Amino acid sequence: MTPEIESVPRPEWSPLPYEGCRNVQGKVLVDEKELLLAVLRFEPDGTIHEHPGATDTVVVCLDGSGFTSVASETAPLHAGQRVRWPAGITHRLWTEDSTMTTLMVERPRHVP
């Protein structure tokens, strides 16, 4: 079987365009119907505002550390850890004095 190799755009870092987000840049790596992969880079005092997501999201901390909240419960997030944000539940991600790089994996909720 021959591997299916396709070219993909080489994304540039760009600031997140959402109101309430600051000091965070992102790169979308894959944007398909069933899967979104993005890398986010947080500077000190970076934040993704509190909001409910439309899809289940897994956040993997690749480097550095920060904080996350899910349904108003707060926890630290360090390199080598992940957190799941269920669809429709309010969540937030931020840094204080440190930097952090995360992989964001979003996929639609499967309804039986």
Residue ranges and their predicted role:
Residues 1-38:
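A short, N-terminal "cap"/entry segment at the start of jelly-roll beta-barrel domains
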Residues 35, 44, 54-55, 73, ...:
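A generic "binding-loop/recognition-motif" signal
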Residues 48-50, 68-69, 85, 91-97:
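Short beta-strand His + acidic residue motifs that chelate non-heme Fe in jelly-roll/DSBH
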